[in-house]
Each structure stands twice: as C-alpha cells, then as structure tokens.
UniProtKB/Swiss-Prot annotation:
This is Glutamyl-tRNA reductase. Substrate binds at T46, C47, N48, R49, S111, E116, G117, E118, Q122. The keyword Oxidoreductase applies. It comes from Leifsonia xyli subsp. xyli (strain CTCB07). SUPFAM superfamilies: Glutamyl tRNA-reductase catalytic, N-terminal domain, Glutamyl tRNA-reductase dimerization domain, NAD(P)-binding Rossmann-fold domains. NADP(+) binds at G191, T192, G193, K194, Y195, A196.
Length: 432
C-alpha cells in the first residue's frame, strides 16, 4: 500500500513547514526505522511543502487509518511537533490518490505558482537521496520514474511552464513597485545554490549590474568567478548589507542568516532610506524581527504565496489531463501486479507439463529440436489469451476471479506476491 503524508502551503502555516524542513533528515531516519511496517520511503522537502511517500506492508483497507496514524506519530516525534497540530495541517493520500498527487506535484500543478519549473528537479533529487539511503522500494522507484516522465510530458506538451512563473521571478515582480530603476540597484545575494543562480538570472533580466554574493558556507568566491559577480570577503557581511538596496537570501542553512544584529552598520549608512529583503529560504533565512527595523521591508515566502497568480486555464487543464491519464495508467499497471502470482503459477503449470512430456519423448527417441521449439511456441500461444484476459480483469479490479478460475480448473496453489525488498544504493553495493 502506498501512503503519502503531505503538509504544504495549501494545508499548513509556513512556520510549521519551516520546522518540518529543518527536521527532514530526522524524519527520514525515523520512517526508515519502522521496518516492520514501512518497506520503502522517500521524503520530499521543498520551500513550500514537506511530503513523505511510503510503501506500507499492509494491503488491507482497514489498516490505512492505523498506518496513517503511525506515520503522523513518527513525523511528529522526529520533528518535535504535536500530533494533533500535524494532523490538522496535513493530508494523507493512499494508493491511487497518492500516486496521482505525486504526479500533480512533480508537474507543478500543486505549487504556489502553478507551472513553476523547480519542483520536477526537487522530486528527482528526493528519489536520489532515498536511493543513496537505501530506502526506495520497487513500487516507489516505479512511481517516481512515472512522475518524472509525466512532468516532462507536461512541460513539452502544454504551455504551463510559461503560464506559471518561478518563485524567484514572482518575488521580483512583487518588488517591482519598490524599485524605480533596476539598473541602479545594488544587490546582495546570500546563497550560492540553484535558487541563487535563478535569482541572479532574473535580476540581470531586469537590468541589475551591481551584485555581490555572500555564502555562509564559504562558496562565494567560486560562485562569483563562475557568474561574474563580486564575492563578499570574510567578515564583510555588515559592509555588504550597508551597501545594498536589495538583499535576496536563498540558502539551505538551518540557522538564521540575517538577524536584526546584522543590520547595525547598514542602519547607519547614509543615502539608503529603505531596504528590501527577499527571503526565499526554507527554513527561513531571515529572522522575522528584521521587518521591525526602520527602513527595512521583508518579503518572505508566506507573503509571496499570497500573491501567486492563477495559471492560464487552458494550459493548466491540458496539464491535468496528462496527469490524469498517467495516473490512471499507473493505477492500471499497479492493479496488474495482483494477478502476477496466478499468471506465474499457470505458466509454471503448463511448462512443467510440457517439460515432462518432452522428457518422456526423449526417452522414446521421439523428440527433435524443431519439435520441442514448436511445442514451446504452442504453449506460449495457448497462454497468451488467458494472460491478456487476466490483465484485463486485474485492471477492472477482478484479479481474484482469474485466480479462482485457475485454481478451480487446474488445481493450482497460488502463492501470495512477495513483499518487494528495498533497493540498495549502488555505492553501498560496491563498497561492501
């Protein structure tokens, strides 16, 4: 059974998402420790959502509520969040609904800005991280691969990518009313990751030329060289803040990058009456108390999300149609898994009889390679129609009818499908 625990901008306050993101590694570890229940897990933590996709070793519908409560308790304990608060701030999707939700998420349909392009890469990286940790089951691997293919299909076949704007560009759009001339703006960029690159590109599109970069992790020099900007030297953050009209933060550090104390020198700077700080980080990069400083305005993800535009309806509808079709096909393929044990048993039964007859013919000297090949081909032909019919029944939810018929007609003993083991990361295999 697949379960998705989802807490996002649609269901939770950004403070709660902030706390969940900070504890993402602990949550992933806690979920993996429930090996008696969880056979696979992938944790997706982005700037506006926290989700855990789980493969649960319990197919009975009655166990869904118990499994969901177990997941909520594990997440709450690992993140230090009350279970009742977590329950009221999240949604739990099961099986087909969980699959369709991931396909919608990876295609940008569930984002703050519908159609934003960053989420597809974040979904892929979440899968990579889970692979490295050895927590991906075969069913989760298949689901996430379908999600990646679906997001590519949505991007290539609809206009949703252009209808929606990225978080970075939306933030700068909101800042437009505060800026009279982008070419004269002095900008401090804090962070050197993917969002920093996207922010720099968006700033340059608006004509910004004076950009300094600061990195809490010490990567400013490398970023500056590759992007043609100025690196803030060690100990130079205060001076850089004093120089800047606009500060954009987009780091993944756990602690605040900017607090009111960082602005002491900047507050004394002449000539800058108002500074705008755009916080694109989650966890938050900027202490909310910064907004109380005179002459400082703070624009954070929570504020940005309130202004997210509605996507062009046609593009969104086309994207949803693609996602719906992909989700239906995934559900159908998943349903086919239920008939596999019966098909395997039937094929084994037929080919065991065939092998026995060929062996008897050989003892009589009546066999030839051509005859054996013809008989094996005939067996395959005879099995084709029952195999097709079995999959059709499975897709219609009637897999048990085929299993019952096979048991009745052929006296087969059909074993239950084994639980898929977790997929071990390649580097772990080679290292052992």
């Amino acid at each position: 059974m697949l379960i998705c625990f989802s807490s996002s901008h649609r269901t939770a306050a950004f403070d709660l998402l902030d706390q969940l993101e900070r504890h993402a590694p602990a949550v992933a570890t806690a979920l993996a420790e429930h090996s008696e229940l969880v056979t696979g897990s992938v944790v997706l933590a982005t700037c506006n959502r926290f989700e855990a996709y789980l493969d649960i070793d319990e197919p009975l519908p009655a166990a869904r509520a118990v499994s969901a409560e177990t997941v909520i308790a594990a997440v709450g304990n690992a993140a230090g969040i009350d279970a009742d608060l977590l329950r009221s701030s999240s949604r739990v999707y099961c099986d087909d609904a969980a699959a369709e939700h991931l396909l919608s998420v990876s295609s940008g349909l569930d984002s703050v800005v519908v159609g934003e392009g960053e989420i597809a890469g974040q979904v892929r990286r979440a899968l990579t991280t889970a692979r490295q940790a050895g927590t991906v089951s075969q069913d989760l691997e298949r689901l996430f691969q379908v999600a990646s293919r679906t997001s590519r299909g949505v991007k290539n076949r609809t206009g949703i990518a252009t209808a929606g704007r990225s978080i970075v560009r939306l933030a700068l759009d909101l800042a437009e009313s505060r800026v009279s001339d982008w070419s004269r703006m002095r900008v401090l960029l804090i962070g050197t990751g993917k969002y920093a690159g996207a922010s720099l590109a968006a700033l340059r599109d608006r004509g910004v030329a004076d950009v300094q970069v600061h990195s809490p992790s010490g990567r400013a020099e490398k970023f500056a060289l590759s992007h043609g900007v100025t690196a803030v030297p060690a100990g130079g953050l205060g001076a850089a803040l004093a120089h800047a009209h606009l500060i954009v933060t987009c780091t993944t550090v756990r602690d605040y990058t900017l607090t009111p104390g960082n602005f002491g020198q900047a507050q004394q700077q002449d000539g800058i009456e108002r500074r705008l700080v755009i916080d694109l980080g989650l966890p938050r990069n900027v202490d909310s108390a910064v907004a109380e400083l005179p002459g400082v305005e703070l624009l954070d993800l929570e504020t940005i999300s309130l202004h997210a535009p509605v996507a062009e309806l046609n593009a969104a509808d086309d994207a949803r149609e693609i996602v719906g079709a992909a989700a239906a096909e995934f559900a159908a393929q998943t349903a086919e898994q239920a008939v596999k044990p019966a098909l395997i048993a039937l094929r084994k039964h037929v080919f065991d009889i065939l092998d026995a007859e060929i062996a008897r013919a050989r003892t009589r000297g009546d066999s030839s390679e051509q005859t054996e090949a013809a008989l094996r081909h005939l067996a395959g032909v005879l099995l084709h129609t029952p195999s097709v019919r079995a999959r059709e029944l499975a897709r219609a939810g009637d897999a048990q009818r085929f299993a019952d018929a096979a048991e009745t007609l052929f006296g087969l003993r059909i074993e239950e499908a084994p639980v898929h083991p977790r997929l071990i990361a390649v580097d772990r295999v080679t290292a052992s």
